[in-house]
């Protein structure tokens, strides 16, 4: 692995970005290795904000200051790891940590995201490499429960409008941030207005009036930059708009509350045919931290926005609307991403929704659901894109809730659930499907095809989360509905029964699984024939059940028969044939048929080496199992050689901190102990224990197993 590495998308600095030595001095002196700092607005809350209303008080440029700090550390090579996290939800934090673990630790991205995140946090606490983790827009303390990044070589930077009470100052220092100073504001304005110096007339007065509000300065400069008016002309428009707002709302309106309305008027002038405002409302109902640009060019988005513009027939026309919003200072676009990422400040989103009449935001959200579903690729397309899509879906759900079920919009719930499962966010996926399954039965009826699908997904997500006992009632319920609707001999019913058999095994119901799977084998054979792959799969599952029920002889006979028929029907080196043969070898070993076990493992090893290569993870796994069989046979020297080979290959292919590598290191230590190399065994176990403490949670089974082995071999 080449260091330094980074994970997550750091928002690009705004056009004309200026350093803030007066309004944000000393952050580098406060945020040193081993510390954590929260960037918060310096302005105290003066009044409660109504639900859904824009809160302009927190717009002090927190994210931009954090981005500048992060990039400065990166450019100066003061850190080896930079992790940028959209911390607006626990889902996003887990997803970001899982991606960072893959980059920094070489962790298998297929692992459970909660477990991977816990290992990453543990790694941060112990690594000698300097790191920075930015938690951008953290709003709920419970979102970082068990996920707080800390360590002697690391820095944690949080941006938040209001510091969650559960964090408090024992976790981090508060760095209050105000708006730009007068000098900084003027520097920014003059830096943006370089093409026509005549536009600078009145710049000092405009900087004073805007009061250092970063977004107001950005929006005003965007309007000026895409027009011919001067700062003095803009001030005249600003004053008129301020007077209108002052007459309709209590108190003095914030500068940004005025500038954004001027931006909307300017955008409409840049593209007067009508689609700009509908496209703006679409952006306002999605997650403003990161909106995949492809959403705006979908047919659903074009249809919605085009109703005000006699149709938007081409994707490039829709994208032109979005770039117009950028020119007017309403959104930013990061075109270094694929697809381009559109960002919109949450307070501005709330203002747009609040200013929209009647059910316009709801209709926009329902249209956005269709557009999001259309833009969502069949494969999630990377952790960052997947998280952005899920976050946009969550924004829609918060806005319209159960109204998604009135039409076809609820399909976005199903796509989100699938994405959670694909990202191995197992606990969150189970909670999501629990909600979707209940809502689907309520709105569509228990026998609707989508209700059956939701129940199916819930059962599988419970199973994936290790909650087999909770999965079983749903397996039974869905199976009952399938039988009543499709019949007991329908292929979909039989396939579901097969999965239920595996769920019974996971829940400890081995005998019930045997009964079910014996019938399944018979039905599959009658339906498809004895040599059909689905029949052979059912036999494999039945053999698993026999072994789990302690009926090893029957299990071995079934594996033998299936292995022979797979070799004849699918080929000796087919992946499924080798998988069955490996199960047979495992069963032989449990039954103490060591000679048979060795022969079967050798056959699998030959097949894996031939089809996958000698260094594939599956080949390394079978070498490790073969070594254990040799050890059981008393051929200790051969066992040690194979264990050493498996450990070495695993380190090279998977990395020294991968859980499989650590497991093989434990196997090697036990082999050393068996041949009397006590010192080597103890040394290896101590090294493994240190690595487990570094990359695994304290309660991880491997961590506990290593500690027990050390206690037994070395006396502690």
Predicted regions and their residues:
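Aliphatic-rich helical/repeat scaffold segments used for oligomerization and domain docking
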Residues: 1-438, 442, 453-457, 465-480, ...
């Amino acid at each position: 692995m080449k260091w330094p590495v980074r994970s997550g998308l750091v928002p690009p600095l705004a056009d004309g970005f200026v350093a803030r030595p007066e309004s944000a001095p000393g952050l580098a002196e406060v945020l040193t290795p081993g510390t954590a700092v929260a960037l918060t607005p310096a302005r105290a809350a003066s009044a409660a904000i109504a639900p859904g209303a824009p809160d302009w008080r927190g717009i002090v440029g927190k994210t931009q200051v954090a981005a500048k700090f992060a990039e400065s550390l990166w450019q100066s090579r003061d850190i080896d790891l930079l992790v940028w996290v959209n911390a607006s939800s626990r889902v996003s934090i887990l997803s970001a940590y899982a991606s960072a673990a893959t980059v920094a630790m070489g962790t298998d991205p297929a692992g459970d995201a909660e477990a991977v995140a816990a290992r990453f946090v543990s790694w941060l606490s112990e690594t000698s490499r300097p790191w920075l983790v930015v938690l951008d827009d953290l709003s709920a303390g419970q979102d970082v429960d068990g996920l707080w990044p800390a360590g002697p070589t690391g820095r944690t930077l949080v941006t938040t409008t209001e510091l969650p009470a559960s964090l408090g100052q024992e976790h981090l220092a508060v760095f209050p941030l105000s708006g730009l100073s007068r000098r900084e504001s003027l520097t920014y304005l003059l830096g943006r207005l370089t093409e026509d110096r005549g536009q600078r007339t009145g710049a000092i007065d405009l900087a004073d009036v805007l009061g250092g509000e970063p977004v107001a300065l950005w929006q005003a400069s965007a309007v000026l930059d895409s027009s011919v008016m001067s700062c003095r002309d803009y001030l005249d428009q600003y004053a008129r708009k301020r007077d209108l707002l002052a007459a309709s709302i209590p108190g003095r309106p914030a500068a940004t509350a005025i500038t954004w309305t001027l931006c909307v008027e300017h955008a409409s002038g840049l593209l007067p045919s009508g689609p700009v405002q509908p496209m703006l409302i679409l952006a306002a109902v999605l997650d403003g931290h990161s909106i995949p640009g492809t959403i705006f060019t979908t047919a659903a988005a074009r249809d919605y926005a085009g109703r005000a513009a006699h149709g938007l027939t081409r994707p490039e026309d829709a994208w032109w609307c979005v770039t117009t919003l950028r020119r007017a200072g309403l959104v930013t676009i990061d075109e270094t991403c694929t697809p381009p990422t559109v960002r919109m400040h949450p307070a501005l989103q709330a203002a747009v929704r609040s200013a929209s009449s009647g059910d316009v935001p709801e209709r926009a959200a329902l249209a956005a659901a269709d557009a999001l579903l259309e833009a969502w690729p069949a494969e999630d397309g990377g952790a960052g894109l997947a998280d952005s899509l899920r976050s946009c879906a969550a924004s829609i759900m918060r806005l319209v809730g159960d109204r998604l079920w009135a039409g076809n919009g609820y399909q976005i719930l199903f796509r989100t659930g699938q994405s959670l499962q694909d990202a191995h966010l197992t606990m969150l996926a189970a909670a999501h499907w629990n909600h979707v399954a209940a809502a689907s039965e309520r709105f569509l009826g228990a026998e609707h095809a989508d209700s059956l699908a939701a129940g199916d997904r819930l059962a599988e997500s419970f199973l994936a989360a290790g909650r087999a006992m909770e999965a079983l009632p749903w397996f039974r319920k869905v199976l009952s509905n399938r039988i009543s609707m499709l019949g007991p001999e329908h292929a979909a019913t039989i396939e579901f029964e097969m999965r239920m058999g595996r769920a019974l095994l996971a829940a400890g119901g081995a005998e019930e699984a045997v009964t079910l799977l014996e019938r399944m084998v018979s039905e599959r054979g009658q339906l498809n024939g004895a040599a059909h792959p689905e029949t052979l799969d059912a036999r494999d599952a039945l053999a698993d059940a026999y072994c789990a029920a302690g009926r090893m002889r029957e299990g071995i006979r079934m594996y033998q028969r299936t292995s022979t028929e797979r070799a004849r029907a699918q080929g000796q080196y087919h992946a499924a044939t080798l998988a069955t043969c490996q199960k047979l070898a495992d069963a032989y070993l449990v039954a103490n048929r060591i000679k048979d076990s060795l022969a079967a493992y050798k056959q699998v090893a030959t097949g894996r080496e031939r089809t996958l290569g000698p260094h594939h993870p599956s080949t390394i796994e079978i070498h490790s199992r073969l070594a254990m069989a040799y050890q059981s046979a008393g051929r200790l020297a051969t066992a040690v050689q194979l264990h050493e080979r498996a450990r070495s290959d695993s380190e090279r292919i998977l990395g020294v901190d991968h859980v499989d590598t650590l497991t093989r290191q434990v196997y090697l230590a036990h082999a050393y102990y068996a041949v009397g190399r006590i010192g080597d065994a103890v040394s290896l176990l101590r090294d493994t224990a240190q690595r487990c403490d570094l990359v695994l949670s304290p309660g991880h089974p491997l961590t506990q197993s290593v500690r027990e082995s050390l206690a037994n071999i070395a006396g502690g």
